[in-house]
């Protein structure tokens, strides 16, 4: 009977765990829809800023913004690492962290040091354990990304690049493909090249000019900063949509596994109970026969 009591305890424990994972699955599904809506809402703005930046960068060849000039003499590269603040989202963070480690090694082989900005608690913890130099950080963003919370940390990298202290700035995050698929990517944020201004189908942007007020340099300077900020915001929005999707899938898998374990434990319990009843009946029959 002690064995049966232990099995009942295990069944109860797994049932309680399944209730938790089922609730988390439902919460993640709700948050996922909102995160996807925010991500899709941010895309038109990012696309429009991309188009304007393309026109302006091609229309003013006499002026080159610092973001469009390679700092070939710099021996340090920057990376902005976007991860989640919470876990229980499958291999989402593991994949982007693994890709980041590979990028770190590639840069070090080229004689480049790496200085990082962490967006998300998981990435910050990883960078500290990895021994990387963390220039700035943003954690506890919540379920809704706000640009004003990101600007300070991102500006640290932008300023260093403008001063010629960084050879390049990379952006590592998880791109949302669909509910079942997310992809860890590392993109070069700076220096900007013509590839940054191509359309999604790979077609280069057309060249035509604007009338600038007060002058072209002032407008280009402001716009390219906004352009980079838009890229970072879009990356964070994509990462949040990926997080909720991955968490929903992970919790669904956990709930399904818990259901399977409960069924298996219930079968073991029934067999044990049947064996105990059979044993008791045998003892009763044997005792009656002896009498």
Curated annotation (Swiss-Prot):
Disulphide connectivity of cysteines: none
Database matches in PROSITE patterns: ATPASE_GAMMA
Cellular component, GO annotation: plasma membrane; proton-transporting ATP synthase complex
Compartment(s) of residence: Cell inner membrane
Membrane topology: Peripheral membrane protein
Function of the molecule: Produces ATP from ADP in the presence of a proton gradient across the membrane. The gamma chain is believed to be important in regulating ATPase activity and the flow of protons through the CF(0) complex.
Similarity comment: family membership: Belongs to the ATPase gamma chain family.
Binding partners and assembly: F-type ATPases have 2 components, CF(1) - the catalytic core - and CF(0) - the membrane proton channel. CF(1) has five subunits: alpha(3), beta(3), gamma(1), delta(1), epsilon(1). CF(0) has three main subunits: a, b and c.
UniProt-recorded name of the protein: ATP synthase gamma chain
Gene expressing this chain: atpG
């Amino acid at each position: 009977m002690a064995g049966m009591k232990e099995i009942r305890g295990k069944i109860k424990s797994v049932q309680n765990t399944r209730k938790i994972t089922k609730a988390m699955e439902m919460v993640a599904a709700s948050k996922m829809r909102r995160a996807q809506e925010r991500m899709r809402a941010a895309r038109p703005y990012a696309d429009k800023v991309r188009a304007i930046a393309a026109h302006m960068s091609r229309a003013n060849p006499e002026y080159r913004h610092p973001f469009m000039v390679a700092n070939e003499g710099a021996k340090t590269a920057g990376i902005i690492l976007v991860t989640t603040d919470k876990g229980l989202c499958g291999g989402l963070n593991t994949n982007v962290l693994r890709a980041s480690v590979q990028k770190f090694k590639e840069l070090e082989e080229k004689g480049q040091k790496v200085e990082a900005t962490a967006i998300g608690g998981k990435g910050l913890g990883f960078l500290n354990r990895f021994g990387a130099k963390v220039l700035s950080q943003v954690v506890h963003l919540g379920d809704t990304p706000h640009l004003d919370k990101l600007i300070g940390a991102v500006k640290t990298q932008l300023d260093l690049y403008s001063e010629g202290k960084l050879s390049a700035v990379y952006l590592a995050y998880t791109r949302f493909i669909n509910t079942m698929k997310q992809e860890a990517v590392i993109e070069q944020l700076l220096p900007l090249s013509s590839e940054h201004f191509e359309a999604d189908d790979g077609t280069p942007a057309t060249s035509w000019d604007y009338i600038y007020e007060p002058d072209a340099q002032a407008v280009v300077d402001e716009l390219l900063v906004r352009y980079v900020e838009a890229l970072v915001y879009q990356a964070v929005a994509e990462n949040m949509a990926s997080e909720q999707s991955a968490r929903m899938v992970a919790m669904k898998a956990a709930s399904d596994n818990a259901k399977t374990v409960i069924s298996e434990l219930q079968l073991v319990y029934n067999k044990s109970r049947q064996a105990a009843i059979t044993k008791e009946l045998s003892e009763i029959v044997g005792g009656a026969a002896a009498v």
